[in-house]
């Protein structure tokens, strides 16, 4: 009987002990479960889009992801690339940031690979090419832009001209639409230019001259990494002929954007974002936007038009402590729904929003004023490190390469032999590219 009593007491003790332990565990679990998790904050450096365009998307994202907060910091383009790289190198940079499509060589060591699949089926070939690094993609675009031909409607109507579709037509039209302060109004002797037919030929006052020369060379099958040989020489001669022989453009004139906005320039090359500046400067100016002229194409040989892309994309810092959350934000922004909302909001404060980068959305803009011609060129677009207005600063890849091409333009205008000019140009370009592991072995020109 005593033994049974002791056994009963032991069972009671362990039962009570087990109950206490269970209660304690339940209390701890409930306390832990009920404890509010501190949200993650990701910092997003943006360009071009004001806070009022991004804020509604942040609110929507944070509703769906209550554990993630987004801090949007609108950046000035001035010294942006240097400021961004310095911050990233010092470990105090943003989680998400915007880079130009030509900046991958400068940022490849700072970027976290895109974790999404089906990249190539969503974006046009130029995007896949620009941001591919090995087997990975390194940034996701929320917009697209490219070089287009702007024309002054009134000058074309007065001259009875049609929009040129080839470079030879463009040159002929430029000469015929130009007006100089001469006896007969023609511009054959270098008289003061009153109305210019086309802004081409110089490197100091033609906005986006890099893009214009770049596309002329690409269409002429010039290897921009090794710009020498007959095709490169011909391209430089064609670009400069508007200054040195046709006298329809010179360095005494204001910038091409200012001339076009003033109604004194018939043809002008620029991306779509220049529409905003032109409209603001001269709301009454009647102008149109068109696809780029092309060199003659042999369709039977499979030759296709070549156009020029210049756009921006979102990357995630490799040093971010919250790469998963950062990519979740970029994935949300790059969805069809978010891009549509962003475009609509932006269109409420300016002429139009940023052009959709996704293949499955571009058809909706193909007939839109100003942007339609840019969209129509996406499939055949290419790009390179000879791009204007990337704001990459004096040590940026575009600026350094542009300096060598500007010297080449000036040398041709001063009468130097094209073969000597391109030899110097190739050496300079090669020197810049070698800093990024992109140099091409210098050799005798193939043509």
Please tell me what each predicted stretch does:
Residues 174-175, 222-253, 292-295:
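Glycine-centered hinge/linker elements that transmit conformational signals in sensory
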Residues 64, 69-71, 137, 158, ...:
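Extracytoplasmic/periplasmic substrate-recognition and gating elements
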Residues 368-430:
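C-terminal capping/gating helix-and-loop segments adjacent to ligand/active sites or protein-protein/ligand interfaces
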Residues 1-43, 430-447:
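Short, low-complexity disordered leader/linker segments with a strong preference
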Residues 99-148, 171, 187-197, 209-212, ...:
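Hinge/lid segment of periplasmic solute-binding proteins
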Residues 49-69, 401, 405:
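Short, polar/charged alpha-helical segment
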Residues 38-49, 68-73, 95-96, 138, ...:
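Short, well-ordered beta-strand elements
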Residues 60-126, 130-132, 154-165, 266-267, ...:
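Extracytoplasmic "Venus flytrap"/periplasmic binding protein-like
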């Amino acid at each position: 009987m005593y033994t049974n009593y002791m056994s009963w007491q032991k069972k009671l003790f362990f039962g009570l002990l087990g109950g206490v332990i269970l209660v304690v565990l339940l209390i701890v679990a409930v306390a832990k479960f009920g404890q509010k998790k501190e949200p993650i904050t990701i910092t997003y450096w943006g360009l071009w889009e004001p806070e009022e365009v991004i804020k509604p998307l942040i609110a929507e994202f944070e509703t769906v992801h209550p554990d993630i907060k987004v801090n949007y910091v609108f950046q000035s383009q001035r010294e942006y690339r240097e400021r961004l790289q310095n911050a990233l190198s010092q470990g105090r940079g943003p989680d998400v940031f915007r880079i130009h499509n030509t900046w991958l060589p400068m940022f490849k060591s700072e970027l976290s690979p895109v974790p999404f699949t089906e990249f190539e089926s969503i974006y046009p070939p130029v995007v896949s090419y620009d941001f591919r690094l090995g087997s990975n993609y390194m940034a996701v675009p929320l917009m697209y832009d490219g070089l287009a031909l702007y024309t002054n409607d009134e000058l074309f109507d007065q001259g009875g001209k049609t929009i040129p579709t080839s470079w030879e037509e463009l040159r002929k039209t430029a000469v015929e639409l130009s007006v100089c302060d001469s006896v007969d109004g023609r511009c054959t002797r270098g008289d003061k230019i009153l109305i210019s037919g086309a802004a081409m030929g110089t490197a100091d006052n033609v906005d986006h001259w890099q893009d214009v020369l770049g596309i002329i060379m690409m269409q002429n099958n010039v290897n921009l990494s090794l710009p020498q040989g007959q095709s490169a020489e011909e391209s430089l001669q064609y670009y400069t002929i508007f200054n040195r022989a046709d006298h329809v453009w010179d360095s005494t004139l204001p910038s091409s954007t200012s001339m076009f906005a003033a109604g004194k320039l018939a043809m002008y090359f620029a991306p779509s974002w220049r529409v905003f500046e032109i409209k603001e400067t001269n709301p009454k100016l009647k102008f149109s936007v068109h696809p780029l002229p092309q060199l003659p194409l042999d369709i039977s040989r499979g030759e296709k038009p070549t156009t020029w892309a210049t756009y921006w994309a979102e990357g995630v810092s490799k040093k971010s402590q919250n790469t998963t959350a950062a990519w979740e934000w970029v994935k949300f922004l790059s969805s069809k729904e978010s891009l549509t909302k962003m475009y609509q909001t932006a269109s409420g404060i300016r002429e139009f929003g940023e052009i959709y980068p996704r293949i499955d959305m571009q058809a909706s803009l193909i007939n839109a004023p100003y942007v339609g011609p840019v969209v129509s060129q996406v499939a055949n677009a290419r790009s390179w490190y000879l791009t204007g207005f990337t704001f990459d600063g004096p040590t940026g890849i575009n600026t350094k390469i542009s300096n060598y091409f500007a010297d080449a333009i000036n040398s041709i205008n001063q009468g130097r032999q094209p073969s000597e000019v391109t030899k110097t140009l190739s050496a300079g370009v090669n020197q810049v590219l070698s800093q990024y592991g992109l140099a091409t072995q210098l050799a005798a020109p193939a043509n």
